[in-house]
Amino acid sequence: NFARTAPWWRYVDGACWRAPEGPDSNVDRRQNHPVTHIAWYDAIAYCKWSGLRLPFEAEWEFAARGGLSRKKFPWGNQLVPKGEHMMNTWQGDFPKLNTEDDGWSGTAPVDSFPPNGFGLFNMTGNVWEWVQDFYGPRSHQKRLPERDPKGPDQGSQRIQRGGSYLCHKSYCDRYHVHSRIPSDPTNSAGHSGFRVAGDQ
């Protein structure tokens, strides 16, 4: 039974993209939320259609840092500086109770928290973001070009960055700018999305 192995998921009868929380809901109030349930291949299809692309992992991390170096988060090293939540993650007892101290239990509108030094919102928390690269060893574990390093040329998994609203220090504290996870590129989830990059 999936509910026993992943107790933070729940079945919602009648849910679909037009009614994400069930038959009495709609997407009207979600227009400023990140797009979710996106597999890597979905993100690639959108990029081809729009003339944009997914960022490479190194580009994503550079953008996430917002001009800071050697910091855990886009704003510094404190998770909640001066008691102010800076990203959408799980608060409370994971997975039993989300106290919503940051104001959200699921995705949050993209401008709910302050932007980083480059003016980018939600580089950590809210939804995991696909990047272009195949998953492989960390760049610092092998010799890569100093400028524009790319991941392996092949593999079975792609990389997601940034963490999500389901991340909690007791379970998944991968909401730091340097954290990453391997993911099957055919999988999607309610906490997976993407952002695009462009070339000048």
Predicted feature locations:
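Functional-site microenvironments in short loops/helix caps that host divalent-cation chemistry
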Residues: N1-I181
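C-terminal/domain-terminus segments
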Residues: I181-A189
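Short, structured beta-strand segments at or near domain termini in extracellular proteins/domains
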Residues: S188-Q200
